[in-house]
Regions:
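Extended Gly/Ser/Thr-rich low-complexity repeat segments
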Residues: 196-210, 233-248
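Generic recognition of flexible, low-complexity loop/linker segments
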Residues: 112, 203, 213, 251-254, ...
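Elongated alpha-helical scaffolds
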Residues: 81, 104-133, 263
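A generic structural motif
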Residues: 187-192, 220-231
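Blade-loop segments of beta-propeller domains
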Residues: 67, 74, 93-116
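N-terminal beta-propeller domains
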Residues: 1-96, 134, 138-187, 228, ...
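Ser/Thr/Gly-rich low-complexity blocks that favor extended beta-strand/coil architectures
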Residues: 130-138, 194-223
């Protein structure tokens, strides 16, 4: 009778292995994994534990996505995102807040395209086609949903409009110029040398030679009305102009993260290679300032292909 060779495996840290590794006995993962694992949890120590059962907690309205909210070691919550709706549960599955719909701008089709980042009591949720959403914990039983807004500089204000601290980019062709009818004031006509504007630009900011203006009226693809927040150098045609990197016209970021005490956005719909970061400790202030180490960052990641 043939002897049976038995080998004891005690480490499954590599989890379930790709079938392409079936013959890779030279790979360390081969001896620390399994061909198939069903209804098991991997332990940090390398062992396995049977998956526990589940219990009914709530009925969600159609397709949903669950994301964690960990405020502290002893306070955690569960966000259930569904079509234009947010439900909040505690870690035991009890409902904390239900049917929050205000500013929940995601659709069922977008649920698993959303990205999010948490810092303390705040979660940011992004999608390239939607304004950035901010969820804030007021208490263990109270959460609010609002749209993200860049910080404003109220030391620079004209006609009740403040200077913004958001990032800018010139989407228009490099040869296109804009010509202001005056160097300061409100209700000033701005004329572009080629089709540049759409109605959605109304209410957005521009920079002209580094000076901020805000569009307050749309006339045509080549003409808008502006409020000049910082005095312009001249009324000559100027090629050095830029518009908001992030807007309803150009789309919104697809990626968000906190790193080095900054809030980062990337993958904007119309400029997917753009990566921008807030000032250190000022998560709503993306002003580049004079380029000091603690000020905002606005760069493009270049490569052979354009990726998000």
């Amino acid at each position: 009778m043939a002897n049976v060779l038995r080998t004891v495996y005690t480490n499954f840290a590599s989890g379930e292995l790709n079938p392409l590794l079936n013959a890779r006995t030279d790979a360390s993962a081969y001896f620390n994994g399994a061909k198939k694992l069903r209804n098991w949890y991997l332990l940090d120590e390398g062992g396995l534990m049977r998956r526990p059962g589940t219990s009914y907690k709530a009925t969600l309205p159609g397709s949903s996505r669950i994301i964690p909210f960990i405020f502290s070691n002893d306070e955690m919550a569960i966000f259930a995102l569904s079509n234009n709706r947010l439900d909040v549960f505690d870690s035991a599955g009890a409902s904390v807040q239900s049917n929050i719909t205000s500013n929940c701008n995601w659709t069922t089709a977008q649920l698993f395209e959303l990205n999010y980042a948490q810092f303390g009591d705040t979660v940011f949720i992004v999608h390239r086609n939607n304004p950035i959403v901010k969820i804030v914990r007021a208490s263990a039983s109270s959460f609010s949903v609002s749209l993200f807004a860049f910080e404003e500089d109220d030391t620079v204000t004209v006609g009740g409009i403040n200077k913004t601290t958001q990032p800018f980019f010139k989407y228009a062709d490099s040869a296109i110029t804009v010509t202001p009818a005056a160097t300061s004031g409100t209700g000033i006509t701005l004329t572009a040398s080629a089709d540049t504007f759409v109605s959605g630009h109304n209410g957005t900011y521009l920079t002209i030679a580094g000076k901020q203006v805000k569009i307050t009226g749309f006339t045509s693809a080549t003409q808008v009305t502006i409020t000049i927040l910082e005095t312009l150098a001249s009324t000559s045609a100027e090629a050095d102009f830029a518009e908001q990197l992030i807007s309803s016209v150009r789309g919104f970021p697809q990626a968000v993260s906190f790193h080095d005490n900054r809030l980062w956005f990337a993958g904007a719909r119309d400029k997917p290679s753009a990566v921008v970061a807030s000032q250190i400790g000022g998560y709503f202030n993306f002003d580049l300032g004079t380029g000091l180490a603690n000020e905002g960052i606005n760069v493009s990641i270049t490569g052979d292909t354009v990726n998000e």
